[in-house]
Regions:
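Alpha-helical interface subdomain recognition
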Residues: 5-11, 24, 30-180
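Gly/Pro-rich active-site capping loops and adjacent beta-alpha segments
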Residues: 2
Length: 180
């Protein structure tokens, strides 16, 4: 897995190795979370694109009966187009957020950072779910990367702040802006 855990007990750090001011580590870490969340979101968008590619290959090759393919079903076509539109929108949101961080700093893009975090994670889970559904039982096996991605990336809605926390940040910001 991509996340490890390290426990340090009675660890002493020489003063020359301290980054930033003593006692201000959380603030420093918060400054790095925004760009880190952009990284996660772009990685999730890449997974979404791969999942749509696998979904298209499977739908185009899965024969329901002679010369009748799964890709001809309107529901499957809807899933493909909805997934593509969601990915496109997610990418634009992430690029806009990155620009805001560049221009206004992480603090100035706090609302947008929270929006991309929960929105792109939601897009990821929906796209993976559709791709698994198109693959049928095969999608639940390790013969494709889909089930691994689904299991591994389900945490996207929890780590780095649960969706509900980020939605609360966004709502409070919007309420504050609307009431000013």
């Amino acid at each position: 897995m991509s996340h490890g855990e390290t426990r340090l007990t009675d660890c002493r750090i020489p003063a020359s190795n301290i980054i930033g001011k003593e006692g201000k580590g959380f603030i420093l870490a918060q400054e790095r979370l925004g760009p880190g969340r952009i990284h996660h979101c772009m990685r999730w968008i890449g997974i979404c694109e791969r999942a749509v590619g696998l979904m298209c290959v499977r739908a185009s090759s899965r024969e329901l009966r002679p010369n009748k393919f799964l890709s001809e079903k309107q529901t499957i076509q809807n899933w493909i187009s909805e997934s593509a539109a969601a990915i496109y929108g997610a990418r634009l949101m992430v690029l806009d957020c990155a620009k805001k961080i560049e221009v206004h700093s992480t603090k100035g893009a706090r609302k947008e950072i929270s929006m991309i975090k929960f929105h792109v994670a939601d897009v990821l889970m929906k796209v993976l779910d559709r791709a698994i559904q198109v693959h049928g039982a095969l999608g639940m096996t390790d013969h494709t990367p889909l089930s691994f991605w689904y299991r591994h990336e389900r945490g996207s809605r929890i780590y780095d702040g649960a969706d509900e926390v980020h939605k609360s940040v966004v709502a409070r910001s919007i309420l504050r802006d609307q009431l000013d």
